[in-house]
A protein has these predicted regions:
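Nucleotide/phosphate-binding catalytic cleft detector across ATP-hydrolyzing
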Residues: 1-93, 98-100, 110
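Short glycine-rich, Thr/Ser-proximal phosphate-binding strand/loop in the N-terminal lobe
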Residues: 105-115
Length: 115
């Protein structure tokens, strides 16, 4: 079995619900949860994602899966889903040769390449 490490990650986060005593922003809750999950590099959350946070977090009961993409310098949050979908993380590996193109489906969590 061949394995490969991708440039994206999906992580399930069970965030604490805001209270009068804990008034951290939604963004701060996510960044702290990512750090607790082992993401030590900088994470950028684009404005288009920030606009989706509160309605989605509230509907999801503060249990979400975030998708991160590595841009060569830092992680970028590219998607947010309700619940735990972290196991559903697939990608394509593409080899562009001089005469052929080979494409393989891979499980981005395990790195397993499906032949």
């Amino acid at each position: 079995m061949n394995t490969m490490r991708g440039l994206s990650r999906k992580l399930y986060l069970d965030l604490s619900v805001p209270t009068e005593e804990d008034q951290r922003s939604d963004q701060q809750r996510i960044l702290e949860a990512l750090s607790a999950e082992g993401v030590k590099e900088e994470v950028h959350i684009p404005v288009r994602m920030l606009r989706q946070l509160y309605p989605l977090l509230d509907r999801a009961g503060w249990k979400i899966t975030v998708s991160l993409s590595w841009n060569g310098e830092k992680w970028e949050l590219v998607d947010i889903e309700s619940g735990d979908t972290a196991r559903q993380h697939y990608g394509l590996a593409v080899d562009l040769g001089s005469t052929t193109v080979v494409v393989r489906l891979l499980d981005c969590n395990s790195g397993e390449i499906w032949e």
